[in-house]
Amino acid sequence: MAEQDVENELLDYDEDEEPQAPQESTPAPPKKDVKGSYVSIHSSGFRDFLLKPELLRAIVDCGFEHPSEVQHECIPQAILGMDVLCQAKSGMGKTAVFVLATLQQIEPVNGQVSVLVMCHTRELAFQISKEYERFSKYMPSVKVSVFFGGLSIKKDEDVLKKNCPHVVVGTPGRILALVRSRSLNLRNVKHFVLDECDKMLEQLDMRRDVQEIFRLTPHEKQCMMFSATLSKEIRPVCRKFMQDPMEVFVDDETKLTLHGLQQYYVKLKDSEKNRKLFDLLDVLEFNQVVIFVKSVQRCMALAQLLVEQNFPAIAIHRGMAQEERLSRYQQFKDFQRRILVATNLFGRGMDIERVNIVFNYDMPEDSDTYLHRVARAGRFGTKGLAVTFVSDENDAKILNDVQDRFEVNVAELPEEIDISTYIEQSR
């Protein structure tokens, strides 16, 4: 049951990092620091990367025309098999870097796993596997599977035995359990990827799992690691897995604000939050909204209250069975519901393209969690709005930490907000 314990740990985000110092100056060639103004769209197109026609067709189907800054910097080297260590803001398309780079290079061999991608939560693993399916749409010979705790390991073992995937996405606990049961063979892995790598490498037990898995893969392979937050303490740990990696840090790490995202706070008592939330949902224009709360109980109660007030809400929290969480996540992603109430479980790495407003109904516990929550709105260079409720001195302190660390001014919510500042106008 050891892997179950690891999996359960993955569900909560204990964001206890120290505020990050500006980027270290230790030389580690080749390194790219992409600073200056935040330009999310480059004039070059995906065609410039000379990708397979099947990939280009899938990219067109997804509606992407130009690579983001991080894609522009990473993809040309990544598709050549170079090791990559990349830190870039949430919502800038890091996932597509390793999905496209690995699919570009993959030469599927029946019965062999070529690509191993690991991340720290089940939901993120599920989402990454969906991205692989989306981009490999015109590559029918490429098989993708996702493995994580909370679901029957027997089913996973059957999949590996009867229909061995070329791309495996999963959480470290379940991957290690499958390796130990001799169901998963990693001897042919050519690409080893960690997404939100800091989350896995900061927790010592999870780092041990990752290291054990890493040692079971061939010495000659490509290693890529990505995260929105990479403290200077964790970077040397990442480098130990790599050989002369290309390091890409998009923008200064203290300035992890998101282009196009309007950020405001509202000062009020805890007892006034519901009324204020309902008022704002009435007056603001939104495609989809995520409301973050601090506990399962508050999540369930608020979702119920919203439904009673005729707001189409759905809840996701860590008290739910795994299948139920994934089903609800998919419902929200498919636009069946427009309002999602969630705990931190949902806060990191989740990608819902239509979300343009995030509410911190309860203040996140620290500045990192704040970043990963508000990054749900305004992803991939689009506009968005983040509203944070401040109800006591501790809330105010955390908001000050956010402003100091990310060098951003979070102003008090004005009486009226120009709709064009937080929602894309249809052309």
Curated annotation (Swiss-Prot):
InterPro entries noted in UniProt: DEAD/DEAH_box_helicase_dom (IPR011545), Helicase_ATP-bd (IPR014001), Helicase_C-like (IPR001650), P-loop_NTPase (IPR027417), RNA_helicase_DEAD_Q_motif (IPR014014)
Where found, per UniProt? Answer: Nucleus; Cytoplasm
Q: Which cysteines are joined by disulfide bonds?
A: none
Q: Which GO terms describe its molecular function?
A: ATP binding; ATP hydrolysis activity; identical protein binding; RNA binding; RNA helicase activity
Per the record, the GO terms for biological process are: mRNA export from nucleus; mRNA splicing, via spliceosome; negative regulation of innate immune response; negative regulation of RNA export from nucleus
Identify the PROSITE patterns for this entry: HELICASE_ATP_BIND_1, HELICASE_CTER, Q_MOTIF
How is this chain modified after translation? SUMOylated by RANBP2; SUMOylation modification affects its ability to bind RNA.
Q: Where does ATP bind?
A: A88, K89, S90, G91, M92, G93, K94, T95
Biased composition annotated in UniProt, kind: Acidic residues: 1-19
Phosphoserine: which positions carry it?
S37, S426
Sites bearing Phosphothreonine, chain numbering: T171
- Give the UniProt keywords, A-Z: Acetylation, ATP-binding, Cytoplasm, Helicase, Hydrolase, Isopeptide bond, mRNA processing, mRNA splicing, Nucleotide-binding, Nucleus, Phosphoprotein, Ubl conjugation
How this chain assembles, per its entry, is: Binds ALYREF/THOC4 and DDX39B/BAT1. Interacts with the apo-AREX complex component SARNP. Interacts with MX1. Interacts with MCM3AP isoform GANP. Interacts with ECD. Interacts with PHAX; this interaction stimulates PHAX RNA binding activity.
Q: What is this protein called?
A: ATP-dependent RNA helicase DDX39A
Give the source species: Mus musculus (Mouse)
